Amino acid sequence: MKYFVTAAILLAPLFSMSQLFDEMLQSFNTKPILTAKISTRNSFITNSFMRMRDVGVGLNFDNVTKVGLGYNWLATEVIRPLELTNQEVQNNEGELKMRYLTAFIEYTFLKKKRYNFSIPVQVGIGRAFFRYQTISGNNQNTKPVTVAFYEPAFTAEYTGIKYIGIGLGAGYRLMLLGSQKLDDNYNAPVYLFKFKVYFGDIINDVHN
């Protein structure tokens, strides 16, 4: 856990490193509660618009640090040029398919009654391939390529409805593996919309 926290600190230089480290470590001394999220991230692949969706579950430590796992998938049709050796491709294009698992950590550095500001960071690894049609009209998939991403961001969240958080943010997607084999530029700004459910608060209220 300390190594994960340290990595997040190194990638969030806008804030005091020692304060960030201390607050995160102190939050891990509290009893965690369950948290879940659904988010949408809009971005680009070279000159093509793309939308990623993700769902995640994790643990919330004192509303300061959240850690967990997520599943991400490409939710829009992204058509890219495609040429294959020994295979004729209809229109010389294919549809990108991509999905990956992520580990995420989120540090909330400012909390008010109805809103908060956070630095979420996620690292993901998964697979991508192209689905194309042959000249005869058959659907085929290219060989899957391993992809890996690092995605830091800055988000603002509003909790006007009890147990529910709605947020907006911006960040950057850095592709660590796969860009050369996919022959495209996946490094790009990311614009986020997220929906979060505070299950821990629900459970606490039910028990009380």
PLM feature spans:
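Transmembrane beta-strands of outer-membrane beta-barrel proteins
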Residues: 32-38, 67-69, 101-103, 117-123, ...
